[in-house]
């Protein structure tokens, strides 16, 4: 398959806007790496640079040991799936699948073999003779993926391919893409702003912010040990709760003597213990502001002094607005960050 290497990639437009700044990234052979970040962070631009649709200002791009900076998009052996399905409306599904292969003068028998294989993988055999307008959104996206599969490229690029689908279909397609990529073993880069997609699909995640990589790791590593406050706040639904250490010590008299340098503390909503357990960690006496049922329990927004926390509990609260709620955060479940730099100070 292929190894993608990006070395010191910089992209700056003529108006001076810096989109990507000295970015380094390696995607392993057969890996599915997800680029996740907020809108405008540079993740789609990076994908377009790899595809050859945009030029870098500086830096080197390699697939395996081959430098591809100056190669035309058609010569990079890359296939890309876009947010909009980019299907030819006047062609049948079969026509869309075979179009690129015909342009490359692929033998007819080989075209038929590849289409049959892709259609079976994607379960689209029954509508090969339909036009795109006769298909649902999910079916159109399968056809779009079929177009890249029949190419048999070294690299797949996915640019937010599921953003036009509803939540249920998006979840289903996530599973299908992951299963498909594993079965094909094609090195893949996938762009999304949806952290749930990223956590579901990725072998590894690269969290992008303002054109730079904040952290790279497996989904579990990113969730359990965020390296910056940006990652801690961006990954997780709900995100982490943040609290100034000095405020905690002033109001609760609870001292984190094991890490004097720490300015900022954070904890996940699900790690709290309902009730008062002062031997395990600081106890917060809060007031319920909002309850968000999640089926198995609820997310509860609580007020502590001037701070709003979100906690996750297994109980199903209903009309408890304004009531008092006490909970404990075990000290081993606190993450610690430097408030000035945003960098992690210790693992927990």
Swiss-Prot record:
Enzyme's top EC category: translocase
Topology in the lipid bilayer: Peripheral membrane protein
Localisation: Cell inner membrane
Enzymatic reactions: sn-glycerol 3-phosphate(out) + ATP + H2O = sn-glycerol 3-phosphate(in) + ADP + phosphate + H(+)
GO CC annotations, alphabetized: ATP-binding cassette (ABC) transporter complex, substrate-binding subunit-containing
Gene Ontology annotations of biological process type: carbohydrate transport; glycerophosphodiester transmembrane transport
EC identifiers of the protein: 7.6.2.10
MF-aspect GO terms: ABC-type glycerol-3-phosphate transporter activity; ATP binding; ATP hydrolysis activity
Family that this chain belongs to: Belongs to the ABC transporter superfamily. sn-glycerol-3-phosphate importer (TC 3.A.1.1.3) family.
Protein name per Swiss-Prot or TrEMBL: sn-glycerol-3-phosphate import ATP-binding protein UgpC
Biological source species: Bartonella quintana (strain Toulouse) (Rochalimaea quintana)
Protein's gene: ugpC
């Amino acid at each position: 398959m292929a190894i993608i290497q990006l070395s010191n990639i910089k992209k700056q437009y003529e108006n001076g806007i810096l989109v990507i700044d000295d970015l380094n990234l390696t995607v392993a052979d057969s890996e599915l790496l997800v680029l996740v970040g907020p809108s405008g962070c540079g993740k789609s631009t990076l994908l377009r640079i790899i595809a050859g649709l945009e030029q870098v200002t500086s830096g080197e791009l390699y697939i395996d040991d081959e430098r591809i900076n100056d190669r035309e998009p058609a010569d990079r052996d890359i296939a890309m799936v876009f947010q909009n399905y980019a299907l030819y409306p006047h062609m049948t599904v079969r026509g869309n699948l075979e179009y690129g292969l015909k342009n490359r003068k692929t033998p007819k028998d080989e075209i038929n073999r590849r289409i049959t294989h892709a259609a079976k993988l994607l379960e689209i055999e029954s509508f090969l003779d339909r036009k795109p307008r006769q298909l649902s959104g999910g079916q159109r996206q399968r056809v779009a993926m079929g177009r890249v599969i029949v190419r048999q490229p070294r690299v797949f690029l996915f640019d937010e391919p599921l953003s036009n689908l509803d939540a249920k279909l998006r979840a289903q397609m996530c599973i299908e893409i992951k299963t498909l990529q594993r079965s094909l073993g094609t090195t893949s880069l996938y762009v999304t702003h949806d952290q749930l997609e990223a956590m579901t699909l990725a072998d590894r995640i690269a969290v992008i912010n303002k054109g730079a990589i904040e952290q790279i790791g497996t989904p579990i590593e990113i969730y359990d040990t965020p390296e910056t406050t940006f990652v801690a706040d961006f990954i997780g639904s709900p995100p982490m709760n943040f609290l100034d250490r000095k405020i905690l010590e002033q109001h609760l008299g609870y001292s984190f003597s094991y890490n004097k340098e720490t300015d900022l503390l954070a904890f996940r909503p699900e790690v709290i213990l309902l009730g008062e357990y002062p031997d395990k960690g600081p106890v917060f006496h809060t007031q319920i502001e909002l309850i968000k049922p999640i089926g198995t329990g609820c997310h509860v927004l609580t007020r502590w002094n001037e701070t709003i926390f979100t906690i996750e509990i297994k109980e199903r609260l209903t009309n408890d607005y304004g009531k008092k709620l006490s909970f404990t955060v075990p000290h081993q479940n606190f993450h610690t960050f430097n408030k000035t730099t945003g960098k992690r100070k210790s693992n927990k």
